[in-house]
């Protein structure tokens, strides 16, 4: 095990000098430095660059407070390795695979795998055309998810990405019954804590591994924690042959962490100050999140959109890797429509008659047509009023508003805040409900009866309570 000494500490970036003649550590190797003489406080560094003349530049996975020049650094000779397998289920880790749930740490002989790997080769890949039912009407109808596919939840600050991902965990993890891996990347610690206790109460935690590198942690941890969660998911896919659900909240923070250290590593920034290696880093992560002939990984990723600008390089780079996109729209939150999913901007590769069936496809495209026409008529309504519309257009606007409200529903995970029970709506009930609205069966019911309900039967009950 070769050793060197700290030459420079600049925030999360540490330069280490190795003696001439010593073997230099390889890129991505883990180095260990002890802050105290009795070797109880250690910090893990990861090699990012080799500068020449025995100097390597590393990124710290923990806070560099207390590090000084001259401290000894040991090369472990391998990349950061994390525990994998059944022992990880029901547990909470950090980026290094250390348990942070106050329970017994892992045994020394637990199976471990490095977080840096190659993506599966082309001939190992497998595609699926099976729909993953979420129980959320707007998603199942207009932007359905594929089993073994990749989904992005796009939205600005405070439009409901984390609540939506928590509802998907609640619905899919319980219905799916398989293995789930949740990776918190640079998000609020409070939300992670709430999610942990919620999963513990519901019993889902027994089939879930949770990995966190939250907002307060250094950029090195936030940059690598997604790989830690992915490594655990890959093991269940490749070795155990399981169908795995991988939740990542938030992919933008992974990019943001990379941009924080990029300038300190000596790289010239590119567009909007992001790292020049943005597309490469995103590709290396996303290409590993895939389904093979051994098992599948269905990934659902929350992606923050800075200032609601979808042309920002971070969300724009992620778009290219996804099968389905669920776009959250601030205007809908202002109208009190939750989940605030934009039915026209969201899309899915799965919305085709060959995959969802002729009836589902016909209903979904007609819903989109009606909503698109309503959007076009809104300017006329705002300037001239409803009276200027033809009878046919007035009917269409009425149905469009009912559809818009019917796309909302109460969430199980939000019940503690709203006091209203959540609902899970099977795909068949969703398609039937929208088909009947399009046929004009409920034109006489008030629009408010369609707001925040489950299946169409709930609308009828709500209308009866309102005196209709």
UniProtKB/Swiss-Prot annotation:
Binding site residues for ATP: 155-162
Enzyme Commission number: 7.1.2.2
Mode of membrane association: Peripheral membrane protein
Keyword ATP-binding: yes
Family matches, as PROSITE patterns: ATPASE_ALPHA_BETA
Classification via InterPro entries: AAA+_ATPase, ATP-synt_VA_C, ATP_synth_F1_bsu, ATPase_a/bsu_AS, ATPase_alpha/beta_chains, ATPase_F1/V1/A1_a/bsu_N, ATPase_F1/V1/A1_a/bsu_N_sf, ATPase_F1/V1/A1_a/bsu_nucl-bd
A GO-annotated cellular component: plasma membrane
Protein origin, superkingdom: Bacteria
Keywords from the named record: ATP synthesis, ATP-binding, Cell membrane, CF(1), Hydrogen ion transport, Ion transport, Membrane, Nucleotide-binding, Translocase, Transport
Regions crossing the membrane: none
Keyword Ribosomal protein: no
CDD domains given in the database record: ATP-synt_F1_beta_C, ATP-synt_F1_beta_N, F1-ATPase_beta_CD
Protein task: Produces ATP from ADP in the presence of a proton gradient across the membrane. The catalytic sites are hosted primarily by the beta subunits.
Protein name stated in the entry: ATP synthase subunit beta
Gene: atpD
